[in-house]
């Protein structure tokens, strides 16, 4: 019978301590390399293509910077209102557009009013948006990342009446 470290046909190696040590080291090294390669492969494939943005009664987004991996085909943003006030008093939405378009999008959104979630449905500058949420509510939107051009700067804003000057954030493509 062949032992754990013994090669068939060479029983002398089974009792040589140096051979046993080297053989164990080689097997351990191969197992370690295989394990590390499998882990590295998992990291390369797994991308986080979603995020949650929190808003509150103090007119804040947290975080105010969203990193979107270039490998993501679609990206989902969930807006969670952690405050207590109802949406009629302190509603928030999340609207994505080019950074240079945010002020215009906020103006036309405010004019669109509450029944349109403060987003003009004809405004082609809007890339994606959530509905308006009040305290304890959340809303999600998934969008095609092909709409985002590398090298262009993007941001997000709350277009609820009066919120856009302070409720802003930036998108970083990485």
Question: Predicted regions: what is each one?
Answer:
Residues 1-23:
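N-terminal amphipathic/basic-hydrophobic helices that include classical n-h-c signal peptides
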Residues 65-89, 94-96, 140-149, 153-154, ...:
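Beta-strand cores of secreted/periplasmic/IMS beta-sandwich domains, seen most often
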Residues 20-32:
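Bacterial N-terminal signal peptides that target proteins for export
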Residues 47-56, 97-119, 161-174:
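Extracytoplasmic/periplasmic copper-protein system
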Residues 48-74:
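N-terminal edge beta-strand
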Residues 128-174:
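Extracellular/periplasmic metallocenter environments
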């Amino acid at each position: 019978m062949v032992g754990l470290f013994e090669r068939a046909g060479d029983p002398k190696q089974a009792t040589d301590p140096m051979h046993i040590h080297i053989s164990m080291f080689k097997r351990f090294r191969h197992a370690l390399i295989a394990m590390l390669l499998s882990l590295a492969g998992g990291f390369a494939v797994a991308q986080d293509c979603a995020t949650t943005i929190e808003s509150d009664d103090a007119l804040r987004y947290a975080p105010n910077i969203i990193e979107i991996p270039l490998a993501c085909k679609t990206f989902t943003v969930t807006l969670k209102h952690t405050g207590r006030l109802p949406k009629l008093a302190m509603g928030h939405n999340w609207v994505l557009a080019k950074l240079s378009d945010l002020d215009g999008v906020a103006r036309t959104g405010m004019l669109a009013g509450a029944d349109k979630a403060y987003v003009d449905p004809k405004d082609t500058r809007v890339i994606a948006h959530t509905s308006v949420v009040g305290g304890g509510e959340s809303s999600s939107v998934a969008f095609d990342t092909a709409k985002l051009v590398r090298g262009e700067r993007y941001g997000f804003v709350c277009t609820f009446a009066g919120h856009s000057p302070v409720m802003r954030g930036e998108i970083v493509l990485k």
